[in-house]
């Protein structure tokens, strides 16, 4: 769990996301409160519940990006899901309890990754021994093994083909099966796979591959042998229960509008009802054990173009007490997105062209022109936020991207006149913009 202060979290988010200060503050405080709660003693720790957040704002204003960046910073189990992917329990499809199951799997992967780093040195030695067994045989004399070990460490044997037996599923997740009209059917399928795996020793058939390709799978397999899987699962469940964060995107799409009560609307309302106990706190059975959701933080977000937050079930509104409105992006915001963010679009295109030996640069007036056109098209056609910049940039740089291979060593400067020439007329014609931009 990260121990960043709220100010540090906001500062980190500022590196990648322009504006939306209220939303950044809300998630920063929520994240810090997780850290504060873990430092409380006894019953008080159980009483302090997370204050779930509802982010409201038009598409492309930074809601999902805030969640993506927060996931990288949190150092905690984090899951982003679309509310539209779920159906009411009893209907065909995934039920909302799958959120908790997926969160547990995420936590297990995180903890395994951390523990693999701790045992990597031992795992590398064990993997090296298995590669040597495949190269010279287990009965080879010590001098022969030492000779080949030196060559292996020097990288001289990387292209050599060997036959090794790697357990199925080593380093990867077991395939999951969906059974229609059976809530939680994925668990049954996974458990069945586990049972057969244990019964038959989870052995894999011998595979031929180069030494270079065999190294990582063997290190992963040997590392897994050195870890206690039961301890990992227990730690993962504790981590999910205390630090888990779920980002529920597109929650406005499961709203039931006033006066509308069709078949699909009934199902949407059912998903909301199923979410209530999950957000309030429930015991969810998973293949690894029961998980309590009382202290999982839920951050919901939606554009609410057609519906409004009050169209959500009153009980669900009550379980999302902190509301944050994200402002639509202005021309000035677009300008800052193009220049101020750490991996801005301009830097990305310059780096891409550099791989072809082309030095691409943008003048300040070109940046102003790009921002102005993006804002104009958003206001006249459909406001899709920062995503409009990508469409505009692709259109402006279409010719350069296509011919870059033939222009090695050239220096190309994009100015306002170039932008106007390639996209100006298109942006001014609202009918054309509707279809092309």
Swiss-Prot record:
GO cellular component, one term: HslUV protease complex
Statement: the UniProt record of this protein carries the keyword Cytoplasm: yes
Localization per record: Cytoplasm
GO biological process, one term: protein unfolding
A Gene Ontology molecular function term of the record: peptidase activity
SMART domains reported in the protein's UniProt record: AAA, ClpB_D2-small
Entries under Gene3D superfamilies matching the protein: 1.10.8.60, DNA helicase RuvA subunit, C-terminal domain (1.10.8.10), P-loop containing nucleotide triphosphate hydrolases (3.40.50.300)
Keywords noted in UniProt: ATP-binding, Chaperone, Cytoplasm, Nucleotide-binding, Stress response
InterPro entries from the UniProt entry: AAA+_ATPase, ATP-dep_Clp_protease_ClpX, ATPase_AAA_core, Clp_ATPase_C, HslU, P-loop_NTPase
Keyword hit for Nucleotide-binding: yes
Chief place where the protein resides: cytoplasm
HAMAP family: HslU
Cross-referenced PANTHER family: ATP-DEPENDENT CLP PROTEASE ATP-BINDING SUBUNIT CLPX-LIKE, MITOCHONDRIAL-RELATED (PTHR48102), ATP-DEPENDENT PROTEASE ATPASE SUBUNIT HSLU (PTHR48102:SF3)
Family membership noted in the UniProt record: Belongs to the ClpX chaperone family. HslU subfamily.
Protein task: ATPase subunit of a proteasome-like degradation complex; this subunit has chaperone activity. The binding of ATP and its subsequent hydrolysis by HslU are essential for unfolding of protein substrates subsequently hydrolyzed by HslV. HslU recognizes the N-terminal part of its protein substrates and unfolds these before they are guided to HslV for hydrolysis.
Subunit structure: A double ring-shaped homohexamer of HslV is capped on each side by a ring-shaped HslU homohexamer. The assembly of the HslU/HslV complex is dependent on binding of ATP.
UniProt-recorded name of the protein: ATP-dependent protease ATPase subunit HslU
Organism from which the protein derives: Methylocella silvestris (strain DSM 15510 / CIP 108128 / LMG 27833 / NCIMB 13906 / BL2)
Gene for this chain: hslU
């Amino acid at each position: 769990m990260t121990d960043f202060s709220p100010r540090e979290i906001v500062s980190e988010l500022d590196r990648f996301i322009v504006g939306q200060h209220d939303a950044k503050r809300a998630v920063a405080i929520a994240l810090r409160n997780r850290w504060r709660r873990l430092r409380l003693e006894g019953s008080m720790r159980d009483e302090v519940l997370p204050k779930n957040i509802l982010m409201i704002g038009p598409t492309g204003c930074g809601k999902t990006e805030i969640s993506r960046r927060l996931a990288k910073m949190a150092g905690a189990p984090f899951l982003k899901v679309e509310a539209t992917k779920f159906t009411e329990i009893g209907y065909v499809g995934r039920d909302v309890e799958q959120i908790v199951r997926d969160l547990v799997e995420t936590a297990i992967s995180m903890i395994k990754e951390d523990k693999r780093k701790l045992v990597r040195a031992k795992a590398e030695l064990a993997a090296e021994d298995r590669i040597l067994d495949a190269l010279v045989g287990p009965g080879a004399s010590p001098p022969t093994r030492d000779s080949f070990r030196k060559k292996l460490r020097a990288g001289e044997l990387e292209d050599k083909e060997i036959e090794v037996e790697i357990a199925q599923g080593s380093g990867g997740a077991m395939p999951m099966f969906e059974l229609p009209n059976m809530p939680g059917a994925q668990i049954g399928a996974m458990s069945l796979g586990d049972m057969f795996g244990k019964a038959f020793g989870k052995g894999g058939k011998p595979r031929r591959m180069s030494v270079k390709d065999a190294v990582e799978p063997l290190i992963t397999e040997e590392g897994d042998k050195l870890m206690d899987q039961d301890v990992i699962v227990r730690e993962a469940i504790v981590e999910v229960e205390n630090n888990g964060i779920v980002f529920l995107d597109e929650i406005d799409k499961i709203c039931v509008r006033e006066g509308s009560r069709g078949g699909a609307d009934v199902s949407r309302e059912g998903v909301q009802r199923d979410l209530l106990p999950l957000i309030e706190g429930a015991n969810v059975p998973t293949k690894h054990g029961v998980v309590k959701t009382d202290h999982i933080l839920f951050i919901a977000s939606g554009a609410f173009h057609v519906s409004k937050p009050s169209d959500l079930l009153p009980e669900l509104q009550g379980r999302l007490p902190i509301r944050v409105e994200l402002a639509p992006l202005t021309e000035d915001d677009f300008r800052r997105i193009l220049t101020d963010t750490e991996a801005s679009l301009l830097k990305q295109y310059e780096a891409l062209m550099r791989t072809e030996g082309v030095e691409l640069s943008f003048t300040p007036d070109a940046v102003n022109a790009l921002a102005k056109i993006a804002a104009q098209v958003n206001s006249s056609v459909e406001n899709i936020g920062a995503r409009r910049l990508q469409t505009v940039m692709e259109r402006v740089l279409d010719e350069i991207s296509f011919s870059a291979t033939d222009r090695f060593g050239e220096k190309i400067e994009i100015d306002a006149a170039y932008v106007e020439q390639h996209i100006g007329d298109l942006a001014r014609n609202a009918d054309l913009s509707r279809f092309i931009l």
